[in-house]
């Protein structure tokens, strides 16, 4: 299963594109609407949210996690990769 998360619904466009390439996969999408947007939040807050969402997605069976949020990628993906070395994280990186 591939887990995808964003601070809102913008990541749905990422989900649609991934699904075109990997239609046989199962997916779970998490939108953190209650805390959207992340842009004005502290780094600590964003990292904490990314950890909590990652844990939720892992509990649901995700093997790969797509961080479909520019802000979460910029702030938290390095931490996620360090803390969850067995999980592949794909971010919105140039």
Predicted regions and their residues:
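Non-catalytic structural scaffold of enzyme domains
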Residues: 1-94
